[in-house]
Regions:
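Structural signal for terminal/edge beta-strands and the immediately following C-terminal loop/tail
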Residues: 213-237
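N-terminal, charge-rich interaction modules
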Residues: 111-128, 142, 233
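Conserved C-terminal alpha-helix-loop-beta "cap" of PLP-dependent enzymes
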Residues: 125-221
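Conserved PLP-enzyme active-site core in the AAT-like
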Residues: 1-103, 117, 122-126, 134, ...
Length: 237
């Protein structure tokens, strides 16, 4: 499941599974951080893979669910090529605990807490000329929303990339969703925030935008911005 593909002209998942199964092809879904742990299997997937460290909030590990013969084939890689990538027992027990906690957690209360954070951030963002903010629902239909912050450089005098860079350079870094930063906007994501984190983000956002008003933020080379994480690996001595 990808957040980075076109959102129109796609066949339904049911149809996709039907075509694959008619040709004897198993459907394996990399569901990563999908919220619903049952939908894909219920609609025909043979194997679904979830991260235990994203929405589930567990340690770094993965959960593989589906057809028993394919799961067994995957398990056999414990003595094959997959051995070098195996997780420790701590992560396995942590993933189990995360699943158990997910089953009993109050999802509605968490959703309300996330909505409160979005309102707080939006109030700050729209108080600046040239900055717009709107709450946007998740494009893959997970029950969550994010704050889309759009910056008009002609009015605000600093670009979205410059603001994102400044946020990431705070004493406590604020990392935004910047997949389409070249279009002049980024997203703030309220998922898995601990108590006090929403206020920390709002304070940093306020400070960065306020400082940009006093003096435009340094320009950001978008090519270098896009390659910064890779360049960091290359520059590591």
């Amino acid at each position: 499941m990808s957040h980075h593909v076109v959102e129109y002209g796609q066949m339904s998942f049911d149809c996709f599974c039907k075509i694959c199964h008619e040709k004897g092809v198993a459907v394996i879904v990399d569901a990563a951080s999908e919220y619903d742990l049952r939908t894909f299997i219920n609609h025909g997937a043979d194997v679904v893979i979830y991260s235990s460290h994203k929405f589930l909030g567990g340690p770094t590990a993965g959960i593989v669910a589906g057809s028993s013969d394919l799961i067994q084939a995957g398990y056999m890689q414990n003595i094959g090529i997959g051995r070098v990538m195996k997780v420790g027992k701590e992560s396995i027990f942590g993933a189990i605990a995360a699943l158990q906690a997910w089953k009993v957690r109050d999802h509605n209360a968490i959703r309300e807490k996330e909505t409160s954070a979005l309102r707080l951030w939006k109030k700050i963002a729209i108080s600046f000329d040239g900055v717009q903010a709107e709450v946007v629902d998740d494009s893959t239909h997970n029950p969550l929303s994010r704050l889309k912050i759009s910056i008009n450089k002609e009015i605000f005098k600093s670009s979205a990339a410059s603001v994102a860079t400044a946020l990431s350079s705070c004493k406590i870094p604020i990392i935004v969703r910047d997949h389409e930063i070249e279009l002049g906007y980024f997203y703030l994501d309220p998922c898995n925030l601990a108590d006090g984190h929403a206020e920390l983000v709002s304070s940093s956002l306020q400070n960065v935008l306020q400082n940009a008003l006093k003096k435009p933020l340094p320009e950001v080379d978008l090519d270098k911005y896009r390659n910064s994480s890779i360049q960091g690996y290359l520059d590591w001595k």
